[in-house]
């Protein structure tokens, strides 16, 4: 799978919209910024379909990768975007890194820790911050922001 993929995940209260550009994207952030909420919304949409009240818009399938069958799921899935929460211990294994490297899928990893076994770009590390105010009748728009910009990557040699 190649190219950019726009992902929109929304219900009547929350709206996430972002673009996946590479095979590995990292989402980081402090507690209560909406990382796990994004995963939960995707899980509900995957498990309950339209009855979940959650709309997922993307040109490729967006799925959750978790549990003990993760390797079996990866072996039988192509051209999808997998979202993985930090609670999954397999993310830190050499076996997972090897599967990601050989996969035709994209991966969005939600974690606060460094993943030394995975070759991801510093330009594909994002955070989430709310762009709207929380009110009972108002939708909250979650925005992604790039943690490291191209200008921060410049190193001066003396």
Regions found by a protein language model. Give the residues of each.
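Hydrophobic anchor at the beta1->P-loop junction of P-loop NTPases
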Residues: 27
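Post-Walker A helix-loop "phosphate-sensing" segment adjacent to the P-loop in P-loop NTPases
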Residues: 44-55
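N-terminal pre-Walker A segment at the start of P-loop NTPase domains
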Residues: 1-16, 136-151
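Conserved glycine(s) of the Walker
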Residues: 33-35
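A short helix-turn-beta junction within AAA+ P-loop NTPase domains corresponding to the substrate/partner-engaging
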Residues: 120-145
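Sensor-1/coupling segment of RecA-like P-loop NTPase cores
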Residues: 100-129
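Conserved P-loop NTPase "ATPase switch" module shared by AAA+ and STAND
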Residues: 70-94
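Post-Walker A alpha-helix
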Residues: 38-42
């Amino acid at each position: 799978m190649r190219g950019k993929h726009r992902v929109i995940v929304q219900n009547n209260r929350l709206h996430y919209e972002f673009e996946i550009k590479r095979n590995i994207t990292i989402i980081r952030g402090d507690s209560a910024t909406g990382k796990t909420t994004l995963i939960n919304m995707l899980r509900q949409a995957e498990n309950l379909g339209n009855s979940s009240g959650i709309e997922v818009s993307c040109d490729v399938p967006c799925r959750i990768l978790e549990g003990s069958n993760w390797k079996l799921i990866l072996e039988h899935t192509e051209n999808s975007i997998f979202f993985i929460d930090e609670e999954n211990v397999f993310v830190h294994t050499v076996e997972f890194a090897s599967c990601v490297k050989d996969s035709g899928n994209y991966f969005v990893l939600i974690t606060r820790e460094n993943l030394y076994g995975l070759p991801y770009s510093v330009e594909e590390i994002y955070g989430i911050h709310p762009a709207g105010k929380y009110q009972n009748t108002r939708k909250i728009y979650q925005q992604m922001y790039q943690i490291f910009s191209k200008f921060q990557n410049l190193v001066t040699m003396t």
